[in-house]
Amino acid sequence: MSLLTEVETYVLSIVPSGPLKAEIAQRLEDVFAGKNTDLEALMEWLKTRPILSPLTKGILGFVFTLTVPSERGLQRRRFVQNALNGNGDPNNMDRAVKLYRKLKREITFHGAKEVALSYSTGALASCMGLIYNRMGTVTTEVAFGLVCATCEQIADSQHRSHRQMVTTTNPLIRHENRMVLASTTAKAMEQMAGSSEQAAEAMEVASQARHMVQAMRTIGTHPSSSAGLKDDLLENLQAYQKRMGVQMQRFK
């Protein structure tokens, strides 16, 4: 796996799924391929994106700044600086300085990532802030190691929280989660279906599922009534894909 592929993988792992994630993935690909060279416009676009947390925006802004060639005197953006200040905690700043000194001695991406993984997310963000604000310089490869270590920590905590939700025994939360998943699967089916004739059936199934979820939410139903809803949808989706000769495993 190339360095930029690895960076893209880690950064996208902390972006919530949805149309915005696809948009960000495209922007990252363009930036890494040297197709997008207008850093100012890119940062303005990033600043106004909804849903993303300030820290995620800060990390993306840092990656764009590292990658897109820009004029020397280009102004640093406040929304990135605020996100990478370690919540203003002086302890984070102290640790960030110690980490920065260690990173100065590293020359490889993996070496930097290993060193960074032993620090807290706040210290890692502060260290990115130091580099972003030009208070310190490291090689691009080392900076990317720092980015990926930060993303790994964030993704780990998101995964723990997601696992807690999936394994919860609370029937109401499980019921709502099944309905949300059915709804998002239906949306994905509609997007994939396109305008071909064979797509009509998939669209119909997706539409029925969405109406069913709406009705269940409106009238209120027993928590077990949603069991199997998403699985039925996925079965329909896979049958449709086979007929279309498409094999997409990513909805499993």
UniProtKB/Swiss-Prot annotation:
Cellular-component GO terms for this entry = host cell nucleus; membrane; virion membrane
**GO MF terms held by the record:** RNA binding; structural constituent of virion
Q: Quote the subcellular location field of this record.
A: Virion membrane; Host nucleus
Query: Where do the segments described as Membrane-binding lie?
Result: 1-164
Tell me, in one coarse class, where this protein mainly resides. virion
Q: Specify whether Transferase is a keyword of the entry.
A: no
Q: In its UniProt record, which GO terms are filed under biological process?
A: viral budding from plasma membrane
Instruction: Specify the superkingdom.
Output: Viruses
**Which UniProt keyword terms apply here?**
Host nucleus, Membrane, RNA-binding, Viral matrix protein, Virion
State the InterPro entries in the record: Flu_matrix_M1 (IPR036039), Flu_matrix_M1_C (IPR013188), Flu_matrix_M1_N (IPR001561), Flu_matrix_M1_N_sub1 (IPR015423), Flu_matrix_M1_N_sub2 (IPR015799), INFV_M1 (IPR037533)
What the entry lists under SUPFAM superfamilies is as follows:
Influenza virus matrix protein M1
Membrane topology, record value: Peripheral membrane protein
Q: Where is this region: RNP-binding?
A: 165-252
Q: Where is this motif: Nuclear localization signal?
A: 101-105
Give any Pfam family that matches.
Answer: Flu_M1_C
The entry's family comment says: Belongs to the influenza viruses Matrix protein M1 family.
**Its function?**
Plays critical roles in virus replication, from virus entry and uncoating to assembly and budding of the virus particle. M1 binding to ribonucleocapsids (RNPs) in nucleus seems to inhibit viral transcription. Interaction of viral NEP with M1-RNP is thought to promote nuclear export of the complex, which is targeted to the virion assembly site at the apical plasma membrane in polarized epithelial cells. Interactions with NA and HA may bring M1, a non-raft-associated protein, into lipid rafts. Forms a continuous shell on the inner side of the lipid bilayer in virion, where it binds the RNP.
Q: How does it assemble?
A: Homodimer and homomultimer. Interacts with NEP. Binds ribonucleocapsid by both interacting with genomic RNA and NP protein. May interact with HA and NA. Cannot bind NP without genomic RNA.
Q: What else is known?
A: Most abundant protein in virion. When expressed alone can form virus-like particles in transfected cells.
Protein's name according to its UniProt entry: Matrix protein 1
Q: Which organism is it from?
A: Influenza A virus (strain A/Chicken/Victoria/1/1985 H7N7)
Classification of source organism: Viruses, Riboviria, Orthornavirae, Negarnaviricota, Polyploviricotina
